[in-house]
């Protein structure tokens, strides 16, 4: 499954109402560690059909970033049934991201 670009308009439908767990990657284009995590998140999205993967650009979607209390990036959040079940700040290897799920 491909990565979904999450914004305030599709957040409710794609994340809150999802019947699958959702891995969210809060990032910014200028963030070096975010650029390290991005291809890993893309890879997970392609490999795992049992989850949704979304990316949220904090510069464009600052309301969503604030709602999640994201002040450092990259921040990875796992949501199930519309609730946060796991969260990690900073770059992580693939194994650690998969373990969050």
Region locations from a protein language model:
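Structural micro-motif
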Residues: 62, 68-77, 95
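Residue-level signature of catalytic and energy-coupling elements of molecular machines
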Residues: 11, 24, 41, 57, ...
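Short pre-active-site segment immediately N-terminal to redox-active cysteine/selenocysteine motifs
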Residues: 19, 26-30, 72
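Non-catalytic, surface beta->alpha helical segment in thiol-disulfide oxidoreductase systems
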Residues: 77-101
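Conserved helix-turn-beta segment immediately C-terminal to the redox Cys motif
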Residues: 19-21, 38-56, 62
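Conserved Rossmann-like nucleotide-binding pocket used by diverse enzymes
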Residues: 2, 7, 27, 52-54
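A short beta-strand-turn-helix
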Residues: 3-21, 62
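Conserved redox-active cysteine motifs that mediate thiol-disulfide chemistry
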Residues: 26-43
């Amino acid at each position: 499954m491909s990565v979904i670009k999450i914004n305030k308009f599709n957040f409710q439908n794609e994340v809150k109402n999802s019947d699958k767990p959702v891995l969210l990657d809060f990032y910014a284009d200028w963030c070096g560690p975010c650029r390290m995590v991005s291809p890993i998140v893309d890879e997970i999205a392609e490999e795992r059909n049992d989850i949704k993967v979304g990316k949220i650009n904090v510069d464009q979607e600052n309301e969503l970033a604030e709602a999640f209390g994201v002040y450092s990036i990259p921040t990875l959040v796992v949501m199930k049934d519309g609730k946060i079940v796991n969260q990690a700040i900073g770059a992580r290897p693939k194994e650690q991201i998969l373990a969050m799920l």
